[in-house]
Amino acid sequence: MDNIVIELFLLSIGASFVQRTTGFGFGIFIMTMLPSIMPSFGEATTLSGILAMTTSLIIVIQKYKYITWRRLLPILFTFVIISIGAIFVLKRMEYHILNILLGITQIIVSIYFAFFSKRIKVKTTLPVQVTAGTLSGLMGGFFGMQGPPAVLYFVSSEPDKEHYLAMTQTYFLAGNLMMTLARAYNGFFTTTVSIGYVYGIAGVFIGNLIGSWVFRHLSGSLLKYIIYAYIGISGLTFLLEA
């Protein structure tokens, strides 16, 4: 039990730090290990979601004046609808299948962001918003890591890093709130999840403080590539275990 408490605390620090520094990645980071220490995959994604929601809430309180709703609502509405559907499907899927899908997803995400993110530009049209929201909803509902598709959209739509951070965190806050309600309805919000949240919340605040300093002073490009490599290795591990 003591080891689990320490792991949750450290994972929460790392995930919150990544989220605060880059604007996304809480679920990607924490879901590399969380499924192995939680009773079920659904409970792991639920705990990841409420911890990520807390991280986003802290940032939104600080950056709310930079929110532009007309660029946010179309992708957000799409995400909510798709992610809720994915959560209902999740209840009926086998764990080893999810392990395989998660491993493949993490490898693809790591390769994309390491090599292609700077080369691909997207327009902020309604079809793009719906597509990004759909992909984000599928990844969020199944794996608790809805960030990559949404981040690509917001990087292109926002004029500076302050607007980018405000928009991404408002998106993640609202999305995680809706997914948490759907997961609770499906029985994934258990006593174990509540206890895990208590263990992880202190780590969330610590990671947010450190990440805030890094966001102000460093570019973080080297950090991103380290994270992408870690995600890819983790994805390969999931595939081998499955």
Identify the residue ranges that each predicted region occupies.
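Hydrophobic alpha-helical transmembrane segments in multi-pass integral membrane proteins
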Residues: 44, 85, 89-90, 95, ...
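Membrane helix-loop-helix hairpins that form the core translocation module of multi-pass transporters
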Residues: 43-115
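Small-residue-rich hydrophobic segments that form or flank transmembrane alpha-helices
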Residues: 4-73, 133, 137, 147-201, ...
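Cytoplasmic-side transmembrane-helix entry/capping segments in multi-pass membrane proteins
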Residues: 68-79, 100-105, 124-133, 163-170, ...
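Selective transmembrane alpha-helices of multi-pass membrane proteins
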Residues: 79-87, 95-115, 199-212, 220-242
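Membrane-interface helix caps of multi-pass small-molecule transporters
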Residues: 17, 21, 33, 37, ...
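Hydrophobic, well-structured mid-protein blocks that either form specific transmembrane helices
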Residues: 101-143
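Interfacial helix-loop-helix linkers and transmembrane-helix boundary segments
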Residues: 60-74, 90-100, 120-124, 189-195, ...
